[in-house]
Amino acid sequence: APVTPGVAVDLSHIPTDVKIKGFSGEDATPALEGADVVLISAGVARKPGMDRSDLFNVNAGIVKNLVQQIAKTCPQACVGIITNPVNTTVAIAAEVLKKAGVYDKNKLFGVTTLDIIRSNTFVAELKGKSSSDVEVPVIGGHSGVTILPLLSQIPGVSFSEQEVADLTKRIQNAGTEVVEAKAGGGSATLSMGQAAARFGLSLVRAMQGEKGVVECAYVEGDG
């Protein structure tokens, strides 16, 4: 598997205004110093026959360790959790930040953007539209049946009851579709990378003062 510094060198050859640095090792402090946004995608991937909850025992410890380092090094950063099972790893991150006395519910996000881009793709395919013209809000986090696409909220598009049932099931099971298609070779990586980039860039645009930037995410409510 490619190591992080090698991936960083590869990325650094792409002509953008972003400066790329790569870090590796157990101590994430050098990578976290001065960070305004941290996205955590570290963890083991699903294999056929597993669901996201099967990853908990390993991934919970990984997230806990990284968030403890965030609490020490960049406690004011906005933190996006991509590591599955998102609904649980976000809760772990929240407890670690609370214990450190630096928790801000407005700065901790479960990144569920992958469900949104999948929904946009599947709806566009079904209705013969361009995916760039479709935006499906998805709520409930990123754990199987909790994934709830709000299909009734898409302007100018209507669905039969059967279409709603079929689409919802496909969106909820899209991750399994990829895992099975890869036949033991991992889970969704390319589409997840696109989703993570979209969420991260939206966060940065909003932090820079751009108005009207909206993304769905798994967050603590006001209740």
From Swiss-Prot:
- Tell me the enzyme class: oxidoreductase
Functionally, this protein is described as follows:
Catalyzes the reversible oxidation of malate to oxaloacetate.
Pfam families, per database record:
Ldh_1_C, Ldh_1_N
Provide the active-site residues from the annotation. Answer: H142 (proton acceptor)
**What protein family is recorded?**
Belongs to the LDH/MDH superfamily. MDH type 1 family.
- Does the record bear Oxidoreductase in its keywords? yes
The record's EC number reads: 1.1.1.37
Gene source species: Klebsiella oxytoca
Q: Which GO terms describe its molecular function?
A: L-malate dehydrogenase (NAD+) activity
Subunit comment for this entry?
Homodimer.
Q: Does Isomerase count among this protein's keywords? A: no
* Biological process annotations from GO: malate metabolic process; tricarboxylic acid cycle
Q: Where does substrate bind?
A: R46, R52, N84, R118
One Gene Ontology cellular component annotation held by this UniProt entry: cytoplasm
Q: What is catalysed by this protein?
A: (S)-malate + NAD(+) = oxaloacetate + NADH + H(+)
Q: Where does NAD(+) bind?
A: N59, I82, T83, N84, M192
**What does the UniProt keyword field contain?**
NAD, Oxidoreductase, Tricarboxylic acid cycle
**What does UniProt give as the signal peptide span?**
none
The protein depicted here goes by the name Malate dehydrogenase
